[in-house]
Amino acid sequence: LASNSSSYPSSAFASSVKNPARLLNTHFLMPPDIIPVELMSCGQTDAAIIPLLAERFPGYGLTPYVVRRESMGFIFNRIWAAIKRETLAVVAEGVATPQEVDAIYHQATSGIPVGPCRLMDAVGLDVVLAIEEHYAHERAGLPEAPRTLLRQLVAEGRLGAKSGRGLYDDYGPA
């Protein structure tokens, strides 16, 4: 039994399953054409399960990364959270437009095809907001401005690509 959540570790619901030795997180990144998958134990996961998945996932075109200890956000999303929050702060403060943020990000990262604003639009700003609210609840001291901007966009129905408008307005009708 595997959870895809990177915000909620499977240890949070291990007591609710019959056999927690079969429980773990397998976090597939978004959008779905990104191939890393993070594997994290619930703390009671059978010691053979994660190595087995790490061995088999490459056969499906996936690159497994084992999270060595429980961590809300796992590996990538902890790094991504900082990029995302600072991106939203830059836009919220009027320092740069989403297009300018993505353009400089693209150039500075040797051509990563999608900047942080497009990626947040692809994930869905409502989803990004829910994750950010959860992180803020779990980690004191995170800046408020990024969540304020997200709340405003979501209230306006600007959810990203799925609604036709988000940080970008060029998606066409949803």
Regions found by a protein language model. Give the residues of each.
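A broad, low-specificity signal for short, low-complexity segments enriched in glycine/proline
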Residues: L1-N4, A130
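Rossmann-fold dinucleotide-binding core
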Residues: S3-R69, G73, N77
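N-terminal alpha-helical segment
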Residues: D33, I83-K84
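NAD(P)-dependent Rossmann-like dehydrogenase/reductase catalytic/cofactor-binding core
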Residues: A48-P51, P58-E70, A92-E93, P98-A174
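Mid-domain beta-loop-alpha active-site segment that forms a flexible
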Residues: I75, I83, V123-V127
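Residue-level signal for cytosolic alpha-helical hairpin/rod architecture
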Residues: K84-R85, E132
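Short glycine/serine- and small hydrophobic-enriched flexible loop segments
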Residues: R85-A92
